[in-house]
Curated annotation (Swiss-Prot):
Residues 1-23 form the signal peptide. Residues 24-57 form a propeptide. It comes from the Eukaryota. The keyword Secreted applies. The keyword Secreted applies. One of its GO terms (molecular function) is toxin activity. This is Myrmicitoxin(1)-Pr2d. GO terms for cellular component: extracellular region. It is found in: Secreted. It comes from Pogonomyrmex rugosus (Desert harvester ant).
Length: 85
């Protein structure tokens, strides 16, 4: 089954329009220069900036990934040694 070229063009156009929309200041209400007059908006902007500045720790995901990637090896060992004898 061949994917039509129109679908590719549509996906690219939607992706570009979405990235351009996120780049405008209207999409970011916390980047509004008038927000400094409102203390609640300023506190919200500071909280968002602080949350975006802190990176997510990758350490909790590593043991889970190691476990999931080891499952095919364990399955192979069980089939070779226990099932097929």
């Amino acid at each position: 089954m061949e994917i039509p070229k129109l679908l590719y063009i549509t996906v690219i156009a939607i992706g570009l329009s979405g990235s351009l929309t996120c780049a405008t200041p209207l999409a970011n209400p916390w980047a509004d220069p008038e927000a400094e007059a409102n203390p609640e908006a300023k506190a919200t902007a500071e909280a968002i900036a602080e949350a975006l500045a802190e990176p997510e720790p990758a350490l909790p995901a590593l043991p889970l990934l190691a476990f999931l990637f080891s499952l095919p090896a364990v399955q192979h060992w069980v089939e070779k040694n226990w099932i097929n004898g």
